[in-house]
């Protein structure tokens, strides 16, 4: 910074440097006395602390001007720097201090230093009226002494709190016996006053600990709360218990003193504060005190909590619903009590009516627990299962996940639901989520909602569901909790609706066939393999899929699975096991046999596929399966032999396996599907036989198939009048041997459960031209082999069915308390 350059008087012109580098002559300025020279000196960089801030002594008078010099001023703002020395003085007092005054001020500051420290650290020790000079120039900037005083103030407050705590504890300890006696007084006025005093004491930590350590006091509070009719007494007693419930010792004392029945009784109180105290105290007990759940159930707390769902206080409802979730989780009796009290309807109403995230989250948790209860499912669906679906687009991830779990649990009971196009579209979109749980739930819900519901199938296909599901399977890798429900959904979408053929082609066009064949190999478990086999069977209904499936090696792998499953069933039968239908990963090997043979049946419609099957030397196995005690296995075995017999070479190989006798026996089967296929195989095998043999066979077929009905055989025009679209099975996930109903499965997502249709229907005409395709016997009127889904009964084809043992059946993966 340029400075004034002072020259001795008479030494020539004096000049001042300016920021612009120009100099002006100040020689003509009037001479300055000593005071003015001192003030001028203070304007430049030599200005120092006079001791007011640092406490150091100095001979310079106190500074009364700014610390800014000329270089800090912007001369470009039009300021006249030539008279700057005098402009500085205009804003300040022109009073000058003598050296004596400066010394006096410094001495005063030195003498009051200890007082300033005492005032900062212990202000209560100062006498009233004493004024102590402060060194704080800026109110926003504390001095060093003030900053150092903060820890001492904290220490002082801690000491004071400790003294007060001890005083509170001593007071409470002395007062508790007397207050306990007053709470037991017969005079309700005395009881009310005592309850108020105890409530006040419970607000302080020391006395609160003293109260909770006195079982007699807590018991007296509970008795007073139970017996009084005075609302104020009830409020104070409930408030005291609420304060105690924030400590584990307090919870234990309340529990042992019988406080839970008294608190449950208060849930009927008309006073808001009493209700709040009661529900929050019960909530704390349910969360942290062992034995509280059973005590609340026995006291009738569930019924009263369900009634409280009609209130409109959002935070109160959030606590109440959380209590219901704690009580219902893992306890079937509690779920049934909530159902009987009308809980599902109220919970769905809350989901529809409010937007408070915490309330929606706690309510969705209750619905998730109730949705695994077979009795509650229909009630929730009837009340409006769309309630949870309203929040699938919510920004709260925990709420979205709970809603999805709930919908997945409910979806097997809502397979007949309609007008859910928006939900289906949202689910397809959620398949693209990065959250594994969301994708898992979305796939499971789609699997259930497309079960035996043509409208839902069409909707999912139209909103890009096929592509989304194939992409999900490709991205899921070995995560079977995702691939299995996704495969099952595709299986439903590829049969029995107007868009089925499009869906069958779409799976191929979106490169789904290679990954599906890959899923037939390890490490896939049996539930997933079973679902994939069913999907491949449906895909084989599309002629364009035959060659790709064959090229990707589907046929040899399916035959390997068939042989493995059959050998397993044979080992159990040979071992003489009492239960010949044991489960492996929740799947019966008989189901795998049925499914694989059914898939081969459909794939054998194509000539090249038939050649591959013949080359795998499995016709003898098909012949053995004709002796199976299970009608559905007999039916699919006869069906695949019927297709293989379409070629002369195949017919000869079948006859060489000695199948004539079992096939003739099956003509008399009570299962019309088995008899029909057996007749078709025998007829095709007789093509090269003498005319007499054909005539005898025709008579045998007529007498066996129509059993006395006067239906004449005509010329053998074939089985063209048997509508193959009617002969398709329902969306079988071949869980028909152990499912508890549509959608209920032992592992993996719920699937279509029709016990009759196993893997396949009676489709007798090969898609490719064969030597016998147009010369098969007319079996008379169409036999409607399409059966409605059954709710857990035996095979509608009359096959033997062993009732499911609940101990052997794995819990459905969507039916668990999560």
From Swiss-Prot:
GO BP, sorted A to Z: cell adhesion
GO cellular component, one term: cytoskeleton
Annotated region described as Disordered, given as residue ranges: 1-24, 48-71, 732-818
Subcellular location as annotated: Cytoplasm; Cytoplasm, Cytoskeleton
ARM repeats: 164-203, 248-287, 412-451, 454-495, 501-541, 543-582, 648-687
Lineage: superkingdom: Eukaryota
Alphabetical keyword list: Cell adhesion, Cytoplasm, Cytoskeleton, Repeat
CDD domains listed in its UniProt record: CTNNAbd_dArm
SUPFAM superfamilies referenced in this protein's UniProt entry, alphabetically: ARM repeat
Keyword Glycoprotein: no
Gene Ontology terms, MF aspect: cadherin binding
Residue ranges, compositional bias (Polar residues): 1-21, 48-66
Summary of the function given for this chain in its UniProt record: Binds to the cytoplasmic domain of the cell-cell adhesion molecule E-cadherin, and perhaps to other (membrane) proteins. The association of catenins to cadherins produces a complex which is linked to the actin filament network, and which seems to be of primary importance for cadherins cell-adhesion properties.
Family statement: Belongs to the beta-catenin family.
Protein name per its UniProtKB record: Catenin beta
Originating species: Urechis caupo (Innkeeper worm)
Lineage: Eukaryota, Metazoa, Spiralia, Lophotrochozoa, Annelida
């Amino acid at each position: 910074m340029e400075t004034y350059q002072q020259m001795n008087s008479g030494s020539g012109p004096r000049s001042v440097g300016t920021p612009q580098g120009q100099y002006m002559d100040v020689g003509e300025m009037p001479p300055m006395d000593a005071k003015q020279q001192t003030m001028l000196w203070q304007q430049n960089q030599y200005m120092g602390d006079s001791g007011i801030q640092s406490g150091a002594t100095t001979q310079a008078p106190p500074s009364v001007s700014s610390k800014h010099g000329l270089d800090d001023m912007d001369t470009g703002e039009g300021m006249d720097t030539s008279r700057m020395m005098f402009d500085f003085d205009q804003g300040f007092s022109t009073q000058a201090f003598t050296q004596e005054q400066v010394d006096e001020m410094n001495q005063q500051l030195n003498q009051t230093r200890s007082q300033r420290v005492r005032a900062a650290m212990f202000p209560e020790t100062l006498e009233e009226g004493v004024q102590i000079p402060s060194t704080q120039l800026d109110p926003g900037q504390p001095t060093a002494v003030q900053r150092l005083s903060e820890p001492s103030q904290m220490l002082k407050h801690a000491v004071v709190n400790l003294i007060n705590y001890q005083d509170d504890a001593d007071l409470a300890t002395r007062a508790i016996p007397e207050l306990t006696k007053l709470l037991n007084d017969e005079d309700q006025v005395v009881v009310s006053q005592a309850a108020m005093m105890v409530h006040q004491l419970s607000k302080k930590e020391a006395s609160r600990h003293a109260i909770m350590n006195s079982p007699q006091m807590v018991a007296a509070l509970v008795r007073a709360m139970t017996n009084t009719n005075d609302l104020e007494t009830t409020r104070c007693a409930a408030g005291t218990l609420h304060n105690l419930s924030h400590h584990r010792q307090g919870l234990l004392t309340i529990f042992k003193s019988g406080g839970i029945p008294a608190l449950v009784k208060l849930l009927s109180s008309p006073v808001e504060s009493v209700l709040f105290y009661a529900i929050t105290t019960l909530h704390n007990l349910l969360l942290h005190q062992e034995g509280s759940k059973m005590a609340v159930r026995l006291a009738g707390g569930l019924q009263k909590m369900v009634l409280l769902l009609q209130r409109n206080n959002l935070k109160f409802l959030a606590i109440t619903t959380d209590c219901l979730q704690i009580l219902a989780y893992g306890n079937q009796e509690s779920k049934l009590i909530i159902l009987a009290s009308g809980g599902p309807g109220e919970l769905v109403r809350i989901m529809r009516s409010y937007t408070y995230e915490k309330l929606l989250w706690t309510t969705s948790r209750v619905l998730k627990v109730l949705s695994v209860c077979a009795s509650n499912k229909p009630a929730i669906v009837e009340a409006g299962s769309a309630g949870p679906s309203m929040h699938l687009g919510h920004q709260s991830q925990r709420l979205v996940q709970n809603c999805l779990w709930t919908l997945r649990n409910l979806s097997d009971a809502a397979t007949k639901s309609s007008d859910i196009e928006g939900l289906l579209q949202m689910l397809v979109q959620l398949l693209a989520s990065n959250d594994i749980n969301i994708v898992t739930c979305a796939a499971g819900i789609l699997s259930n909602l497309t079960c035996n519901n043509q409208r839902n199938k069409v909707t999912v296909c139209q909103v890009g569901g096929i592509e989304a599901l194939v992409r999900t399977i490709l991205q899921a890798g070995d995560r079977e909790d995702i691939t299995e429900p996704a495969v099952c959904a595709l299986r439903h979408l590829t049969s029995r609706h107007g868009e089925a053929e499009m869906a069958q082609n779409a799976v191929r066009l979106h490169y789904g066939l290679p990954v599906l064949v890959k899923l037939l190999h390890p490490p896939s478990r049996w539930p997933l393999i079973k679902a994939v086999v069913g999907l491949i069977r449906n895909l084989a209904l599309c002629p364009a899929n035959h060659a790709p499936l064959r090229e990707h090696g589907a046929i040899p792998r399916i035959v390997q699975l068939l042989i493995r499953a059959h050998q397993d069933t044979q080992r159990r039968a040979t071992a003489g096991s009492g239960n010949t239908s044991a489960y492996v990963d929740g799947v019966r090997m008989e189901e795998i046999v049925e499914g694989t043979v059914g898939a081969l049946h459909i794939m054998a419609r194509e000539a090249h596929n038939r050649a591959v099957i013949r080359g795998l030397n499995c016709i003898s196995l098909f012949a053995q399966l004709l002796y199976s005690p299970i009608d559905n296995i007999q039916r699919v075995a006869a069906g695949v032999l019927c297709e293989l017999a379409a070629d002369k070479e195949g017919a000869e190989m079948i006859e060489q396996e000695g199948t004539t006798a079992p096939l003739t026996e099956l003509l008399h089967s009570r299962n019309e599907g088995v008899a029909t296929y057996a007749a078709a195989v025998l007829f095709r095998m007789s093509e090269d036989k003498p005319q007499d043999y054909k005539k005898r066979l025709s008579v045998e077929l007529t007498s066996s198939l129509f059993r006395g009905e006067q239906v004449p055989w005509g010329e053998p025009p074939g089985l063209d009048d048997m509508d193959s679209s009617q002969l398709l099975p329902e969306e079988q996930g071949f869980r028909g041997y152990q499912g508890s109903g549509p959608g209920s499965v032992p592992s993996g997502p719920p699937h279509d459960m029709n016990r009759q249709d196993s893997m396949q229907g009676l489709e007798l005409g090969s898609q490719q031209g064969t030597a016998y395709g147009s010369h098969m016997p007319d079996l008379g009127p169409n036999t409607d082999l399409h059966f409605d889904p059954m709710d857990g009964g035996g095979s509608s084809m009359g096959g033997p069915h062993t009732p499911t043992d609940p101990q052997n059946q794995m819990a459905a993966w969507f039916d668990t308390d999560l």
